[in-house]
Amino acid sequence: MVVNVGLIGYGNQAKRLEKFFSRNKTVLKSIYHPKKASKNFTNNLEDLYSNDCIFITSPNHTHFEYLKRLTNDFSGYIFCEKPPIINEDELIFLKNLPDQKKQKIFFD
């Protein structure tokens, strides 16, 4: 089974994941970066929504905003680097998500 993956961000962790994916039955289909748009990158987050899962590897302070947006708009699996949140309000938001959404969110 081939898994289509999208990445948010393209720092060190994303580059490590890219190498890992290339050695497994995973297709890195798209990479989102808010300031880059080219053949390999998109600056439109919705371009990632056709993937089976999305990895959030962006800077720490952006994790929650991406989690919030993806839990509203994306139906696949979400893998988020730590820390996923930076305050209690963000924790409460994640805690109050429906169980169906929580079952598709994973943290590293």
Would you name each region that the model predicts?
Residues 1-39, 49:
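N-terminal Rossmann-like dinucleotide-binding module
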Residues 1, 46-50, 71-73:
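Flexible, charged surface loops at secondary-structure boundaries
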